[in-house]
């Protein structure tokens, strides 16, 4: 009579899937011009989500809360009360 002796050795059988392995690209937010730097009108000063920094003198706020210079001048970051900050642009005389 024929007798079969089947032996299965360790091997990789099935491969599962993972839910990791992806990341979003950075949005490059933050200060684009430093305090004391000279800027021209229309220059982006600060990119942000929400109003982390508020617009001050001669500074406008875009639809995505980006702060930009309205006039040529020098950038100044200032405190606005106890807990707020603002950025202003003062024209050079």
UniProtKB/Swiss-Prot annotation:
Q: Cross-referenced InterPro entries, in alphabetical order?
A: Ribosomal_bL27, Ribosomal_bL27_CS
> Per its record, what are the GO molecular function terms?
structural constituent of ribosome
Record bears the keyword Ribosomal protein: yes
Q: Which UniProt keywords apply?
A: Ribonucleoprotein, Ribosomal protein
| Domain of life the protein comes from | Bacteria
Q: What residues does the annotated propeptide cover?
A: 1-9
Q: Name one Pfam family in it.
A: Ribosomal_L27
One GO cellular-component annotation of the UniProt record comes to: cytosolic large ribosomal subunit
**What does its PTM field state?**
The N-terminus is cleaved by ribosomal processing cysteine protease Prp.
Query: Where are the residues of the annotated region Disordered?
Result: 14-33
Key word Ribonucleoprotein present: yes
Which segments of the protein form a coiled coil according to its record?
none
Signal peptide start and end residues: none
A GO biological process held by the record: translation
Per the record, the similarity remark reads: Belongs to the bacterial ribosomal protein bL27 family.
Query: What protein is this chain from?
Result: Large ribosomal subunit protein bL27
Q: Tell me which species this is from.
A: Exiguobacterium sp. (strain ATCC BAA-1283 / AT1b)
Gene name in the database record: rpmA
């Amino acid at each position: 009579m024929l007798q079969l002796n089947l032996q299965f050795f360790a091997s990789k059988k099935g491969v599962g899937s993972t839910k990791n392995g992806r990341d979003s690209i950075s949005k490059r937010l933050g200060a684009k011009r430093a305090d004391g730097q000279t800027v021209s009108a229309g220059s982006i000063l600060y990119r942000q989500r929400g109003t982390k920094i508020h617009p001050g003198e001669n500074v406008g706020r875009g639809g995505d809360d980006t702060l930009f210079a309205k006039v040529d001048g020098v950038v100044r970051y200032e405190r606005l009360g106890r807990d707020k900050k603002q950025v202003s642009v003062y024209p050079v005389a």
